[in-house]
A protein has these predicted regions:
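Non-catalytic alpha-helical scaffold/packing segments enriched in small hydrophobic residues
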Residues: 72-76, 97-100
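Short, basic/hydrophobic alpha-helical segments
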Residues: 74-87
Length: 203
């Protein structure tokens, strides 16, 4: 039972890895920490992620569909800093954008877009350096993130007595599952050499 409940907590944390927004008064998983999209929004507001800084490109993901997805994702990739383009990267997208890319690619070329050997889909023209990664927990996101795996940090505390899992009985026929833990996400760096965000730029 503990394993099952712990797994459900893990699923909830994963579901909100992007859209979580820290609210000290909240009681839901989405209130526990700032997710990657929330961090991105704060950095855009602070102008540390911007077109001028080279770590953002003005592309509205909501405009991507099955007739333009290939060209738009190529445009995003080509806007990345040369240092970033030299690295093995991932382009994190919503499932709908991935589906649009696959449909557009097949319509345009008559072929499937993914590498049959590795079952991975790469941005056309990236020489298999930029993998398109659809994430169910990114559905509805206003951003596309192009970066390296190493730049996406997930932090937990696994030492000491600060984390605990327990089942407590406070009244008849009722058990409480109590978990105390530390959890958070962050970009290792938002420099243009490691990160490019695609999103709609507002004045």
């Amino acid at each position: 039972m503990l394993n099952f409940l712990s797994a459900k907590v893990g699923e909830a944390l994963y579901d909100h890895q992007w859209d979580a927004k820290r609210n000290a008064e909240g009681t839901k998983t989405v209130d526990l920490f700032d997710g990657f999209d929330t961090i991105t929004e704060k950095e855009i507001t602070a102008k540390t992620i911007s077109v001028a800084n080279g770590n953002m490109v003005n592309v509205d993901p909501s405009t991507i569909n099955s007739t333009n997805a290939v060209e738009v994702l190529k445009t995003i990739y080509r806007a990345a800093d040369p240092h970033l383009r030299r690295l093995k990267t991932q382009m994190f997208v919503t499932p709908s954008i991935y589906d649009a890319y696959c449909d557009d690619y097949k319509t345009t070329t008559g072929a499937i877009p993914y590498n049959t050997q590795f079952k991975q889909t790469f941005v056309e023209g990236s020489e298999n350096r930029c993998e398109i990664v659809p994430l169910s927990n990114k559905a509805g996101s206003k951003y596309i993130h192009l970066t390296t795996k190493q730049n996406m940090l997930v932090g937990v505390c696994q030492e000491g007595d600060d984390e605990s899992v327990a089942v407590e009985k406070h009244e008849a026929f009722r058990l409480l599952f109590v978990m105390t833990m530390f959890y958070g996400v962050e970009f290792e760096t938002i420099s243009k050499e490691r990160l490019l965000v695609a999103g709609k730029v507002t004045a």
